[in-house]
Curated annotation (Swiss-Prot):
PANTHER family membership: D-ALANINE--D-ALANINE LIGASE, D-ALANINE--D-ALANINE LIGASE B
InterPro entries: ATP-grasp (IPR011761), ATP_grasp_subdomain_1 (IPR013815), D-Ala_lig_Van_CS (IPR000291), D_ala_D_ala (IPR005905), Dala_Dala_lig_C (IPR011095), Dala_Dala_lig_N (IPR011127), PreATP-grasp_dom_sf (IPR016185)
HAMAP family: Dala_Dala_lig
Cofactor note as given: Binds 2 magnesium or manganese ions per subunit.
Molecular function terms, GO-annotated: ATP binding; D-alanine-D-alanine ligase activity; metal ion binding
NCBIfam families given in the database record: D_ala_D_alaTIGR, PRK01372.1
Database matches in SUPFAM superfamilies: Glutathione synthetase ATP-binding domain-like, PreATP-grasp domain
GO BP: cell wall organization; peptidoglycan biosynthetic process; regulation of cell shape
Protein's UniProt name: D-alanine--D-alanine ligase
GO cellular component: cytoplasm
Keyword Manganese (UniProt): yes
Catalytic activity entry: 2 D-alanine + ATP = D-alanyl-D-alanine + ADP + phosphate + H(+)
Keywords assigned by UniProt, alphabetized: ATP-binding, Cell shape, Cell wall biogenesis/degradation, Cytoplasm, Ligase, Magnesium, Manganese, Metal-binding, Nucleotide-binding, Peptidoglycan synthesis
């Protein structure tokens, strides 16, 4: 008898549309892998989540939610209480990764290089620039590059107008160079991919619009640097306590003549996209792992923690 898998998707975060696409694509792959699949469009109401889980009676929950509630430990906590195994990382790892300031502190303590940065509060918004330009301003707990600003010379800073929902944001030095991402599956890296985009950086549109970005797999960097990027991705996965699949985003700064390139960890995504243009399925395919095989492995690795 095949396992029943409930796919949680949608949600009420800024990444709702992406989650709907991830959930639909994952559901199709799960059916191809032989599972009995139910789809649930989940909001931020824990009582509604409990009702949906009770009605669908899954053996495993496939969490295709992105952003707040689905990615920050809330859904994971509810499923832990219900005793229903679920894919991706557990409560603590999810909460840690979603808080960018806390995650970068864990990375630094594990010897993983991070950009210079600090947390700025709403009350600091009218002060001088928090860091030398160029710098990056990002919400502490959003994904898919939602609400990210790059502040360059002769550009207005968003801080005085404060177009953010939260009272705190993270400000980091902008790292020039190239955009890399590395997928981790269990305790091994699937490889490193370079992303190029005409948008200047890998923003929401570049991530999810067809043709918004170009992917180079494997990343065309020296073998030693490629291996180091893989090592850092696994180290970050372990520093956060992740399980299942994660994706580490890094910068590769090879812009200084006469200086060796440097790798800088930006963040780890514990709920990487599962859309047709998503990176983890692409990197898995490069290793000969089909999308149905990938989601089957994720279901087999599901647990409560």
């Amino acid at each position: 008898m095949s396992k029943r898998v409930t796919v949680l998707m949608g949600g009420a975060s800024a990444e709702r549309d992406v989650s709907l696409r991830s959930g639909a694509a994952a559901a199709k792959a799960l059916e191809q892998a032989g599972f009995e699949v139910a789809l649930v469009d989940c909001d931020r109401n824990p009582a509604e989540l409990v009702r949906a889980i009770t009605e669908t009676r899954p053996d495993v929950v496939f969490n295709a939610l992105h952003g707040r509630f689905g990615e920050d430990g809330c859904v994971q906590g509810v499923l832990n209480l219900l005793g229903v195994p679920y894919t991706h990382s557990g409560l603590l790892a999810s909460a840690a990764a979603m808080d960018k300031a806390f995650a970068r502190a864990l990375f630094a303590s594990a010897g993983i290089p991070v950009a210079e940065g600090r947390v700025i509060t709403r009350t600091d918004r009218n002060g001088p620039d928090p860091l030398p330009r160029p710098f990056v301003v990002k919400p502490l707990n959003e994904g898919s590059s939602v609400g990210v600003f790059i502040v360059r010379d002769n550009q207005p800073s968003p801080l005085p107008d404060w177009p953010f929902d939260a009272d705190e944001v993270l400000v980091e030095s902008f790292i020039p160079g190239r955009e890399l991402t590395a997928a981790v599956m269990g305790d091994r890296a699937l490889g490193v991919l370079e992303i190029t985009s005409d948008h200047g950086f890998y923003d929401y549109e570049a991530k999810y619009a067809p043709g918004g970005s170009r992917h180079l797999m494997p990343a065309p960097i020296p073998e030693a640097d490629y291996a180091e990027a893989c090592r850092l991705a696994v180290a970050a996965h372990k520093a956060l306590g992740c399980r299942g699949v994660s994706r580490a985003d890094l910068r590769y700064d090879d812009t200084v003549p006469g200086q060796p390139p440097r790798l800088v960890m930006l963040e780890v995504n514990t709920q990487p996209g599962m859309t047709a243009t998503s990176l983890v399925p692409e990197m898995a395919a490069y290793q000969g792992i089909t999308f149905p095989e990938l989601v089957r492995w994720m279901v087999e690795e599901a647990r409560c923690d």
